[in-house]
Amino acid sequence: MIHHIPNVLSKEQVAEFRKLMEEANWVGGKVTAGTLSASVKRNQQLSEQDPLTHHLSDIVIKAIWQNPLFQAAALPHKIIPPLFNRYDEHESFGFHVDNSIRLIRGTAEQIRTDLSCTLFLSEPDEYEGGDLVIEDTYGYHEVKLPAGDVVLYPSTSLHEVSSITAGTRFASFFWVQSLVRDDSKRHLLFSLDESIRELRKSHGDSYSEVMKLTNIYHNLIRMWSEL
């Protein structure tokens, strides 16, 4: 399932990110690509060793751990520290699938990539082209969100960033190992969580059905989660 998570960063935070990123030193994006995806990857990245990458990454990590909608949709167990890229005119990243296992930066720890995430750092009207195109069983989905918003989607999906025809597209990208690896189970849990939240709004926390559904939700987490 594809999730749109709005306002992960404020407009003020985005503006500060952009100021720092526009003054940064960029390297070729193929440094983090697998052998197959490197052949279709034409973009630029901040180096993983750049102190700016660490600084911005810490801000993004804090924001997503504190975002209730992200937590409900992803059920994160581990998060790869975010990286940052830019696409200038004629740059793109053709259809590819993300690596199933990745190292956490600066450690020997590996994580399974269950969910892929893009945090948009350019407004849609700042560039032409550059859509994130995600393929799933229902077809192709073109995604271009406001700056500060995140799209979250299964890492099993083929996806691309279409060619930039004008302007520059800045973004952050990262991966999540979920407590629940199966996308269909995560979707069921998210739908149940949404129903519980709506019942709490309309009937209050002491409503008996809220208690029953919350019990079911947590028991399903116990049944399906991996730690």
Swiss-Prot record:
Q: Where is the Fe2OG dioxygenase domain?
A: 78-178
- Which keywords does this Swiss-Prot/TrEMBL entry list? Dioxygenase, Iron, Metal-binding, Oxidoreductase, Vitamin C
What PANTHER family does the record tag this protein with?
Answer: PKHD-TYPE HYDROXYLASE YBIX (PTHR41536:SF1)
Q: Is Transferase set as a keyword in this record?
A: no
Where does this protein hold 2-oxoglutarate?
Answer: 169
State whether keyword Metal-binding applies: yes
Which NCBIfam families did the record assign? PRK05467.1-3 (NF003974), PRK05467.1-4 (NF003975)
Record-annotated membrane-spanning stretches: none
Q: Which Pfam families match?
A: 2OG-FeII_Oxy_3, PKHD_C
The cofactor binding remark recorded in the entry reads:
Binds 1 Fe(2+) ion per subunit.
Q: SMART domains from the xrefs?
A: P4Hc
Which cofactors, by name? Fe(2+); L-ascorbate
List the HAMAP family.
Answer: Hydroxyl_YbiX
Q: Where do the annotations place Fe cation binding?
A: 96, 98, 159
Q: What is its EC number?
A: 1.14.11.-
Q: Name one GO molecular function term.
A: L-ascorbic acid binding
For biological process, the GO terms are:
DNA damage response; intracellular iron ion homeostasis
Q: What is this protein called?
A: PKHD-type hydroxylase ABSDF3031
Q: What is the organism of origin for this protein?
A: Acinetobacter baumannii (strain SDF)
